[in-house]
Amino acid sequence: MNPVIKTFQFGQSTVTLETGRIARQATGAVLVTVDNDVTVLVTVVGAKQADPGKGFFPLSVHYQEKTYAAGKIPGGFFKREGRPSEKETLTSRLIDRPIRPLFPEGFMNEVQVVCTVVSTSKKTDPDIAAMIGTSAALAISGIPFEGPIGAARVAFHESTGYLLNPTYEQLAASSLDMVVAGTADAVLMVESEAQELTEDQMLGAVLFAHDEFQAVIQAVKELAAEAAKPTWDWKPAVANTELFNAIRAEFGEAVSQGYTITVKADRYARLGELRDQAIAKFSGEEGQPSASEVKEIFGEIEYRTVRENIVNGKPRIDGRDTKTVRPLNIEVGVLPKTHGSALFTRGETQALVVATLGTARDAQLLDTLEGEKKDPFMLHYNFPPFSVGECGRMGGAGRREIGHGRLARRSVQAMLPAADVFPYTIRVVSEITESNGSSSMASVCGASLALMDAGVPMKAPVAGIAMGLVKEGEKFAVLTDILGDEDHLGDMDFKVAGTAKGVTALQMDIKINGITEEIMEIALGQALEARLNILGQMNQIIGQSRTELSANAPTMIAMKIDTDKIRDVIGKGGATIRAICEETKASIDIEDDGSIKIFGETKEAAEAAKQRILGITAEAEIGKIYVGKVERIVDFGAFVNILPGKDGLVHISMLSDARVEKVTDILKEGQEVEVLVLDVDNRGRIKLSIKDVAAAKASGV
């Protein structure tokens, strides 16, 4: 086919969508170019045969940044791209979340989306271009998809308001970084971090983005009108209404009773028994439904039971109403040898969170398309299988763990002190020890507590809460502090983190159309009420950061020297600074402006290194008395070392008031003596006296 090109204006940017020239064997392929600056190739391939045995929709999204896109060669021995970076993993999730709910229910054909950044500058993030390309590639592929979607990034400044698709430079000066995606009628996904913005400002950003990305949706529709392949002849399986009614008649009441059991393990055990009974009764013999079909229908009965109870005003699974937060149990300082720790328990969700302080050298080195940079703050989230009472894979972090860790990081990052105030590298690790809903928000609360326990001067405590939604027709219920089952069976996962003053992070995933501005306002209002409740209970345990660091934390001393003295501290080939580090067991970082940070495992080690540096950089003061060591004796006097690397001359006439025939009559090499600095000439030569020390002391020097 001949290439089809569609160009449109998106805010201040010109976007071009092209198909039919590259990757023509893919089911759908679109090359997206933004301002002749960022180019992303997006391909979609759909399997023709379904894979119903998997039990879930097999969609995979792979976002990859090629280093050649920025004119770079990969580092490392192999000199080629390796496993996905954290940025690539997070962007893959960002693209997956808004498109997944738009595939029809029951569609089980494998779909793979690959977004490849093939050209980019260092001005803007290519993720929005990749999301636009994904929407376009799906729209022309013929695969059943209820799109297209649009996407936009929003920044916010108090003076200028909202800004569409900002550059990296503009984002750095912004108090908001938000990505929004959705269809023409509804918002489906929000990912953001903010600096204590109000709920109204956050909602305004969502609505602003939705209005602005209508241009994307219209352009994709126009491209599809010219270049789309025929829509697949796919129809969902016909529902077995008779079997559904039979199982519900037999087990519906028991399922409803099962969902009144508040303890998760007991509830799961009872529902498992009922499920096994249903499978035994309605499947097995030839001509009867399969066990998987009965299991699927049983799951549908569970789904409807929980939802109907909630929208009809009945108590939730654990007996709460829609606005109540589960009971909290909060402890800090739970681990004796760590720098800061907290155990945060909310109902059956529990996080053990540990904060560790390190030196500037411990910062994470990131090799991105924009170049290398150091990250002094890390937040890692671990979700072991025992947290849900299961056996499972142990190993490196998966996509979910990386995503939850980044959300928790975004939530607390704005409240961390500036590097010049607190120049430590900070690592927070959240170990989820129990999970029944919203472990990421438990990590936020635990991280704030652990950081304050470690003595990190937080600007304000941070708490997070997960909201849910059940909507049936015109009826809906917004749920505060959702359980795992409510997350799975509900229509929305809406996480809000912030301080008492404002929002620091908002993440929203919506599974249905029809989420109105009113529903989002109610959710934000309930989230604020819950957040303030949690913060109040956290503040009763630890309301502000400890004034002193843990005795186990490294001691940091900051100082500044004259830039002319830097080479003296470093020494030839680094010999001097290396010797100081080896002898004191401290680590030393020197900046070009003379700023020095000394880190020691103990206060004594850091102080010893500081004194060594002061000794090297100190200048002899005229009129000051020093205790020096005789280094060398000559006929006309003695050279005395008064500071590291600084010797002065005591002339023979300055040794004593009495006449001295030989210097060795008064001094010997290695002897310690008190000397007075008489003068320092313009060549740095120091003139000393021993005989004038007594008079100087008498005068109060």
From Swiss-Prot:
Pfam assignment, any one: S1
Keywords: Cytoplasm, Magnesium, Metal-binding, Nucleotidyltransferase, RNA-binding, Transferase
Disulfide bridge positions per record: none
Assembly description: Component of the RNA degradosome, which is a multiprotein complex involved in RNA processing and mRNA degradation.
CDD domains: KH-I_PNPase, RNase_PH_PNPase_1, RNase_PH_PNPase_2, S1_PNPase
Primary role: Involved in mRNA degradation. Catalyzes the phosphorolysis of single-stranded polyribonucleotides processively in the 3'- to 5'-direction.
Residues engaged in binding Mg(2+): 487, 493
S1 motif domain ranges (all copies): 623-691
EC code: 2.7.7.8
Family, similarity comment: Belongs to the polyribonucleotide nucleotidyltransferase family.
Catalytic activity: RNA(n+1) + phosphate = RNA(n) + a ribonucleoside 5'-diphosphate
Cofactor or coenzyme needed: Mg(2+)
Domain KH: 554-613
GO biological process: mRNA catabolic process; RNA processing
Annotated localization: Cytoplasm
InterPro entries reported in the protein's UniProt record: ExoRNase_PH_dom1 (IPR001247), ExoRNase_PH_dom2 (IPR015847), ExoRNase_PH_dom2_sf (IPR036345), KH_dom (IPR004087), KH_dom_type_1 (IPR004088), KH_dom_type_1_sf (IPR036612), NA-bd_OB-fold (IPR012340), PNPase (IPR012162)
Chief localisation class: cytoplasm
One GO term describing the cellular component: cytosol
A GO MF term: polyribonucleotide nucleotidyltransferase activity
Keyword Protein transport recorded: no
Protein name per its UniProtKB record: Polyribonucleotide nucleotidyltransferase
UniProt gene name: pnp
